[in-house]
Curated annotation (Swiss-Prot):
One of its GO terms (molecular function) is 5'-flap endonuclease activity. It comes from the Bacteria. InterPro entries: 5-3_exonucl_a-hlix_arch_N, 5-3_exonuclease, 5-3_exonuclease_C_sf, DNA_polI_H3TH, FEN, HhH2, PIN-like_dom_sf. Its EC number is 3.1.11.-. It comes from Buchnera aphidicola subsp. Baizongia pistaciae (strain Bp). This is 5'-3' exonuclease. Residues 173-269 form the 5'-3' exonuclease domain. PANTHER family: 5'-3' EXONUCLEASE FAMILY PROTEIN (PTHR42646:SF2), FLAP ENDONUCLEASE XNI (PTHR42646). 5'-3' exonuclease acting preferentially on double-stranded DNA. It is an enzyme of class 3 (hydrolase).
C-alpha cells in the first residue's frame, strides 16, 4: 500500500542524521553574538519543510544518545571511524531541542540507545495499532523497517521507499538488509562483514540461499556457485562465520527496546509563538520572524 501525505499518521524524523547535514550545509552561519547557528537554521528549515508537506501528520523527532550503546559493547570498533562531534555543533544541540519543543514537536532521546532503535521500536508499536508511519532519514539502515504500514522518506526529497522500491534500490527485500550488511559490512558504521565479500557477491548469495543463516546451512554448495573466487568466498565464510553473524546483529535495528512510549507522550502540542519569536530574533532569523508574525511560519502546526 502506498502511503500518501494525507494518511501518514506519524512522521518519525531521524534527528541525528539531519543534525550533521544541517551543520555542514550552513557552516558559516552565526548569530548576533558571533556564535555558530547553522545547524539550528538547517534543522528548523527541514522541520518547516516537513510541517508544510505533512500538515496532517503527528511529527516526532528522535535523537541519538551521546553515551555508548550495546553495539559498542558487542564490537568496540563500532563507529570508531567517525570523527568526534565538533564543539560548535555540540553548542547548538540544546538550543535545537529548546526550539523544537516550543514549536510543539515531541523529542525522544534515551540514554544508551541509538535513534535507529527508538525509531524501530516506536514504528513497530504504531504499525501494530494500524497507524501509517513515515520515517524521514538520510540513513539507509532504516529501510529494513519498511513494510505495508511503514515507509521511508529519503531526506527532504519526495522519494518514498515502499517494499518494492527498497527491493529495486538495494536488490533485496527490507528484512534482508541486515543479512546483506552482515556479509558485505558497512564502512559508515565500521561494521566489518566478511573479507572479500562485496555487495555483488552478497546479493548473489542471498538470492541463491535466501538468508545469512541459510547460506551457512548450505555452505558446502558455495564452491559450485557461479561466482568469482567461489573457493576464496567459501573459505572466508568458514573463517569469519562469527564475524558475519556479529555484523548482522550490529546492523539489525531493535524493534523491542524496553521503553514506555505512549501515543500521548508523542502527541504534538500547540506552539508557543512568543518563545519562537524571541528565539528567531536572538539568532537573526528575521525573515522567519516576519512570517511568524503574519501567521505563515507555523500555519500548518496543530
Amino acid at each position: 500500500m502506498i502511503i500518501y501525505k494525507k494518511n501518514v499518521n506519524y512522521l518519525l524524523i531521524d534527528g541525528t542524521s539531519y543534525l550533521y547535514r544541517a551543520y555542514y550545509a550552513f557552516l558559516k552561519f552565526k548569530n548576533n553574538f558571533n556564535k555558530p547557528c547553522g545547524a539550528i537554521y538547517g534543522m528548523l528549515n527541514m522541520l518547516r519543510s516537513m510541517l508544510l508537506k505533512y500538515p496532517y501528520s503527528n511529527i516526532v523527532v528522535i535523537f541519538d544518545s551521546p553515551q555508548k550503546t550495546f553495539r559498542n559493547e558487542l564490537f568496540i570498533p563500532y563507529k570508531k571511524n567517525r570523527p568526534k562531534m565538533p564543539n560548535d555543533l555540540k553548542e547548538q544541540i540544546l538550543p535545537i531541542h529548546h526550539i523544537i519543543k516550543h514549536i510543539g514537536i515531541p523529542i525522544i532521546s534515551i540514554p544508551h540507545v541509538e535513534a535507529d532503535d527508538i525509531i524501530g521500536t516506536l514504528a513497530t508499536k504504531l504499525y501494530k495499532k494500524k497507524y501509517f508511519i513515515l520515517i524521514s532519514t538520510n540513513d539507509k539502515d532504516l529501510a529494513q523497517l519498511v513494510n505495508i504500514h511503514i515507509h521511508v522518506l529519503i531526506g527532504t526529497s519526495n522519494i518514498v521507499l515502499d517494499e518494492s522500491k527498497v527491493k529495486k534500490k538495494y536488490g533485496i527485500i527490507p528484512k534482508l538488509i541486515p543479512d546483506l550488511l552482515g556479509l558485505m559490512g558497512d564502512n559508515s558504521d565500521n561494521i566489518p562483514g566478511v573479507p572479500t565479500v562485496g555487495k555483488k557477491t552478497a546479493l548473489i548469495l542471498l538470492k541463491t540461499f535466501g538468508s545469512l543463516e541459510n547460506i551457512y546451512n548450505n555452505i558446502e554448495k558455495i564452491p559450485k556457485c557461479l561466482i568469482k573466487k567461489a573457493k576464496t568466498i567459501y573459505n572466508n565464510l568458514h573463517t569469519y562465520k562469527k564475524l558475519a553473524f556479529l555484523s548482522q546483529k550490529l546492523a539489525t535495528i531493535k524493534t523491542d527496546i524496553n521503553v514506555n512510549i505512549t501515543t500521548k507522550k508523542i502527541k504534538m502540542l500547540p506552539p508557543c509563538t512568543t518563545e519562537i519569536s524571541n528565539f528567531f530574533l536572538h539568532y537573526k532569523f528575521y525573515n522567519w520572524n516576519k512570517l511568524l508574525k503574519q501567521g505563515l511560519w507555523l500555519k500548518n502546526c496543530k
